Amino acid sequence: MNDLPQKFARTQELNHKVSELFQQRVKGAQGRLQARLKDAFAQNAGALAKSPTQLAGLGMNWGDYMTDVGQRSVLFWETLYKRGNQFLAHQRAGLPPVLHFDYETVLDARTFARPVNYALLRIIPPKGVKIDPKRRPYVVIDPRAGHGPGIGGFKDDSQVGVALRDGHPVYFVIFFQHPEPGQTLLDVCETESVFVKKVRELHPDSPKPVIVGNCQGGWAAMMLAASDPDDTGPIVINGAPMSYWGGAWEEGDNDNPMRYSGGLLGGTWLSSMVSDLSNGVFDGAWLVQNFEGLNPANTYWNKYYHLFANVDTEPARFLEFERWWGGFYLMNKEEIEWITQNLFVGNKLWSGGIKAKSGRFLDLREIRSPIVLFASMGDNITPPEQAFNWVADVYGSTEEIKARGQVIVGLLHQDVGHLGIFVSGEVARKEHSQIVSVLKSVEALPPGLYGMKIMTIESKDGEPSYEVEFVERRLEEVIPQLNKYKRKDEKPFEAVAAVSEFNQRAYEMFAQPLVQAMSNEMTAKLARDFHPLRAQRWAVSDLNPWLGWLAPLADMVRTQRKPLTAGHPLRKLEAMGSEFINASLDYYRDVSNAMSEASFFELYGNMFALTMADKEAKLLAEPAVEPRQLPVVQEALAKLANGGFAEAATRIGFLLQRNGEPMPLSR
């Protein structure tokens, strides 16, 4: 009873802070909306008002404008028609990877004793590019998060392209649309370990391969390196979430809303139910729909208006990207449950709570190769806190990083979005290219934590060149800079984990038998085919007999095309209207995100304050013991001077031994 006033005070303080922050978010959203509407008016209608000639000509230009709009409309719908046919053709072909480069299959894990739907490809260098087989090979792991593989080699200016141009052999880990029956994420981890061993066999005279992991492929690469540290070289993880509860509660115009979605939906039970409705298979289109929901302005207006406004030049680029974006892949129920329960909600990757197929727990401190972390302040799917906070959780201090002989390099982009980290040609030419060029320098760095700075130097011919500088940083300074609220905003996620576990058990006991009884392969296929993201594609394709007139009409329009320039007065008014819609949708998104954030902390923040905060305080009451101060460690340090070479070699061998396993002779 004596704790009730203290608990009540905590909840009052929390509710006040949440209310203040919500008001701040909404006020900021309103200010941005007003500013954008004002700018759009000034740049378009305002400019017309200052030009009497253009203003007077508006009435005479309507005919030309309507002709242009009609022609653009036909070409716009023809592009969507082509997208639908491209979607169907891609499906019939089995959704091959969207790689820009030719390739050959080295290993197909569907033929393994424990089959999984993964394969290892060797990228064939394009004409004029020479590869040195003795140079360090690269292994790129693409994300399996709803879309298909290939985004790491989507264009010439890509991670694959910059490594090839630097003379490195490049291998690519892909996956197929349908998972093998019963495969798990731990099976995938073992398979990727086999792939890396195969690459080492193919390049016996080369240094250990670089492992490049994009987004989900990043934490997969870290699991791979922790399970098999003797075969992996430097690890580069791009936009990869590692600390899943992290975010910037008090910083920025709007927070990272994706981290709240699991809690607001009640935890992991929903992914289980969706899988059960699909006969034990999870449809990746639901993940893609979540991504699209993060930016409704782009999803519902911007990308289509950009195509409409530039329909004479834009279709090729639009269709190229849509081929990847519209390729939806599947997971086993066991896989998505493992991801949601152990990572997104459980947050167990950094804590050593994940057990490999071998039976031992994965410890990220076992990784001995340098680690390069690339994140962006503009990424609202993997914010920098999720990319970097695990370092503090795993190592605790700068001294421990050094004591364990680890090199960790952080590279932070200021504004590129999540997809831009992998797709942007500018990012590939600058950040990814420089990462490739300096990996030898990274390996030569003494143990510690470093920031990587890339400085642009303009040359006389106009082509930029780059210089890289490594600045040693202290973990104790970096983490507070990223987490202004001292990570207190992560505490409510402990309540989310508890509620999620309860809801998961309740679903499995009371609802799952009924859901599974209603599901079969036919209902699962119907649900996938009529998913909104698929239906909007095949509905505008050859499958629709009412659209047979569209292609001939588009051909006729092209022969009689009368385009207006973007500076035409009515085109300017059109652009203003588009910006009004765009700004309004962004305002809706910002307010929606603010409401999600406030609801999350009102619910789970209060739950943590009332039921879990006191228990945690008791657990933290005993201060942590510095490992070097333990009596057994002090005794060992005192005896270091005893003995000769044999004793020293024995001690080194004992220290290099991992989890009681014999030390390989190569080490």
Task: Indicate residue ranges for each PLM-predicted region.
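Conserved alpha/beta-hydrolase "acid-adjacent" motif
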Residues: 381-386
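Alpha/beta-hydrolase-fold enzymes
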Residues: 1-78, 201, 205, 222-337, ...
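Acidic, metal/ion-handling microdomains and their immediate structural contexts
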Residues: 616, 621-667
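A catalytic-pocket lid/entrance helix-loop region that shapes and gates access to the active site
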Residues: 228-295, 400-402, 406-412, 419-439, ...
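Gly/Ala-rich beta-loop-alpha elbow adjacent to hydrolase catalytic centers
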Residues: 212-221
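Active-site catalytic motif of lipid deacylating hydrolases and related acyltransferases
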Residues: 134, 143-207, 520, 558-559, ...
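Short beta-strand/loop motif that positions the catalytic acidic residue
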Residues: 367, 373-375, 379
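Short, surface-exposed "cap/lid" segments of acyl-processing enzymes
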Residues: 91-179
